[in-house]
């Protein structure tokens, strides 16, 4: 088995799917099951572990915002925006953890209950419809400074639901922000930055509660394959972050929304067809 090639494929899948409204966990899960023959729990743990590449991409792309956050953390920033972003991330991350950890512990037990892969496709379809409707029915104009505590808690709850396989973290978080009236570019940006603490927490929880599965996943691909997948995911992610934010700044937001919604829906259908459940 060519682990280098598999690492490249998994890296591309992770790098693309993390930023558009298709669940990166689900896509990596399907590829891992198809190419590597991993068990559901091992493949799911591997999908979360692979987010190292997308975390690196977000840190690199938003390095100025991260620098501002660090200054705000030690009260050395003179920008109100840095403190607002820090408040946003702290609250969202806490709520995400309270929602996501119990859901993760539930998910890793699902194979015992016989969860069919078709459920993943159905959840993706629902996710795509929510994303489409949220953008169709609202004209968002808010920025970070307009968000109230209740709004931030809602975003945290939405991001926590992404612990479920089939739910797109970026999709559901961006949709929640736009439903709350946040401008598309700002919604994408906040969603992408909030990935960093959420994904770090997800990796920590995965290693803590699924050490055996993580070990199996790493050995199934080999260390070199894993490293290559992370590097590829990082570069692909940077490209997609830049492309989505640039597109969100244009007057073609409706086109972007329709494309993302269609991708989410088609992805769910193809996922089911690929596994023979439709």
Curated annotation (Swiss-Prot):
What protein name applies here? Answer: Undecaprenyl-diphosphatase
HAMAP family referenced in this protein's UniProt entry, alphabetically: Undec_diphosphatase
Q: Which organism was this protein described from?
A: Saccharolobus islandicus (strain M.16.4 / Kamchatka #3)
Q: Which UniProt keywords apply?
A: Cell membrane, Hydrolase, Membrane, Transmembrane, Transmembrane helix
> What the protein does?
Catalyzes the dephosphorylation of undecaprenyl diphosphate (UPP).
User: One MF term in GO for this entry?
Assistant: undecaprenyl-diphosphatase activity
Q: Record's Pfam families?
A: BacA
Alphabetical GO CC annotations of the entry are: plasma membrane
The record's catalysed reaction(s) read: di-trans,octa-cis-undecaprenyl diphosphate + H2O = di-trans,octa-cis-undecaprenyl phosphate + phosphate + H(+)
- From the UniProt record, report the name of the gene that encodes this protein: uppP
Q: Where is it localised?
A: Cell membrane
